[in-house]
Amino acid sequence: NKNGIKDVYEDPSAPIEARIADLLSQMTLEEKTCQMATLYGSGRVLKDAWPTAGWSAEIWKDGIGNIDEQANGLGKFGSEISYPYANSVKNRHTVQRWFVEQTRLGIPVDFTNEGIRGLCHDRATMFPAQCGQGATWNKKLIREIAKVTADEAKALGYTNIYSPILDIAQDPRWGRVV
């Protein structure tokens, strides 16, 4: 926060309930709303791959809860940012830094990505679709696939991964079934 003092929400030694209450009491309606929103990463809603001066006039000037699929090699920027891997990590770090330093309260962004059959990144390991994985009935193999996906996501700086649904599908046309 840019007020020159360490607020309760910024103090990691303060009780979590006090930190949450302090942060919420300081947030505007716009900031709260933005924390419930997801932007699709570079080349999509987030038109620029790297922060620009224009970002301070966009809706995310008040922060954003989540950026999905940032610098994963898909969208208009392709592999230009996703590889080498250091470039992909640098991109997320630079975007994160912008949100922490340029928004009023400095709330970090959650970077998410798909992981239903491996990390959704143009250089990550891809695995068979969930139906194919499930047909093996091999729980150990599925756990190993999940570990590879998690390790690759963590190494690239993603903080949350969307994974397969553990539910019986009612409609086989649904994308998460295939």
Identify the function of each model-found stretch.
Residues 1-178:
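N-terminal beta-rich core of secreted/periplasmic extracellular enzymes
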